[in-house]
Design a protein with these regions (language model features):
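Peripheral, non-catalytic segments that deliver or gate enzyme domains
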Residues: 1-187
Length: 187
């Protein structure tokens, strides 16, 4: 591909349709490439085969210029998640129903000191690994009709060992716990 993206920083890529979303900053002034302060991270949509100058600005939040933002579109391209971080040790999550034209992001969480990691989406259900109310993590589930954190239900409660990760595969959940400095997986 001839596509080349510059000034993307603290970014991944999330595919949707014939392009992807990425996070970037404005190009710094000449001579300040390595000393410029990163502020007002923006999310753009890049269509494959087009120059970066044609990328569409998708999201920015000038009211919080030092925060980081990323977008994730689930595999079915039915939900889009916006993650906000940089003002604490955690993140906030917002969701948007892509099946509804012109839908807006709905805030799911509101504590930047806690962590919320999307594990999987199945139909309208969303599964999150979080330390909210569980310092050693727990797995919670919610759906698009009830995305606010107060509506989430605990699926796997906090245990005495740290729940490091959860993977969904072949209709099963694989729970990975840290115990005595070694990983232990349970199906």
């Amino acid at each position: 591909l001839d596509d080349h993206i510059v000034w993307a920083k603290f970014s991944g890529a999330s595919w949707q349709g014939d392009g992807f979303y990425y996070s970037a900053y404005d190009a710094p002034q000449k001579g300040r490439e390595f000393s410029n302060v990163n502020s007002i991270q923006k999310i753009y949509y890049h269509k494959i085969g087009t120059p970066q100058s044609q990328d569409v600005l998708f999201y920015q939040n000038p009211a919080n210029p030092m925060r980081f933002y990323s977008v994730y579109v689930n595999q079915e391209e039915t939900m889009m998640f916006l993650t906000e971080s940089g003002a604490g040790s955690g993140n906030n999550v917002y969701v948007r129903d892509l099946r509804q034209p012109n839908s807006q992001f709905i805030q799911m969480t509101s504590n930047l000191d806690l962590q919320y990691s999307l594990v999987e989406t199945i139909g309208d259900k969303m599964y999150f690994l979080t330390n909210d109310g569980a310092p050693k993590n727990r797995l919670m589930v919610t759906d698009l009709a009830h995305p606010g954190f107060n509506e989430w239900k605990t699926l796997v409660p906090e245990a005495k060992d740290m729940l490091e990760s959860v993977t969904f595969a072949d209709g099963k959940m694989i729970l990975n716990y840290m115990k005595d400095a070694s990983s232990h997986a349970f199906v």
